[in-house]
Regions:
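Short loop/turn segments that flank or connect secondary-structure elements
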Residues: 1-228
Length: 228
């Protein structure tokens, strides 16, 4: 199998068969809250049964409300994979559009590592780090951000870079909002591994509206900005 320093999808379907990392506690395709309704409609149009579950669970001890910052489309291989083709390719979620970049370099201070990428058997990520960025495993390096971004743009298509940036921007905004609310004493959050039976989990933006931290219009603006 040919390896190269220019990433090109060969439609092997491996990314759809093995979506999660081996150590991941949530097996399936990550989704944002505004992607769920669209995914459900796409599944219904193709007579596909799906299961969506909340992940990244949080309890606000002040309001006693449980919310989540993400969801997962349960099942591996992906339910939309058929004959090595994605049945919803034009409407696929942002995590798929960003593949194989799991973390955009705009959002971390250190140099990239293998953990910044999703697994693809048809691309040599170690060679990319070594040959394009001059990085060697086990050694400390400092590279100019400009150099890292230039090499990413040479290796990965614009759409991949754009969508990985958008995805990380969302996650960064969510973290910043929670950090600000916590610092101001408006929420008191604790991470939750398992939701008690009968407890409703609401999406993060809905929680912010319920607690009057943002308006419905502001919620819709955020959702519409990132909706694909």
């Amino acid at each position: 199998m040919e390896m190269g320093l220019k990433f090109k999808c060969i439609c092997c379907g491996e990314c759809c068969r093995r979506i999660s990392d081996e150590d991941s506690t949530s097996k399936g395709l990550p989704l944002f809250e505004w992607e769920i309704e669209k995914i459900k409609k796409l599944a219904a149009s193709k007579n596909i049964s799906i299961q969506v579950e909340p992940i990244d669970l949080v309890l606000d001890k002040k309001s006693r409300k449980y919310f989540c910052t993400g969801y997962v489309l349960v099942d591996e291989p992906c339910v939309f994979l058929k004959d090595n083709k994605c049945l919803i390719h034009k409407d696929r979620p942002i995590v798929c559009r960003a593949f194989p970049v799991a973390r955009n370099p705009e959002f971390f201070d250190n140099v990239p590592s293998l953990s910044c990428f999703s697994n693809c058997p048809n691309f040599d990520f170690k060679a990319f780090l070594r040959e394009s960025l001059g990085l060697e495993e086990g050694k400390a390096f400092k590279l100019p951000k400009k150099k890292i971004l230039e090499e990413y743009s040479k290796t990965f298509d614009k759409e991949i870079i754009k969508n990985s940036f958008a995805r990380d921007k969302i996650l960064s905004q969510f973290d910043a909002i929670m950090a600000t609310l916590s610092k101001e004493g408006l929420i008191d959050i604790g991470l939750v591994n398992k939701i008690p039976k009968g407890i409703k989990v609401i999406p993060f933006l809905e929680f912010l509206v319920d607690e009057k931290f943002i308006t419905v219009d502001e919620k819709n603006k955020i959702s519409n900005e990132f909706a694909t």
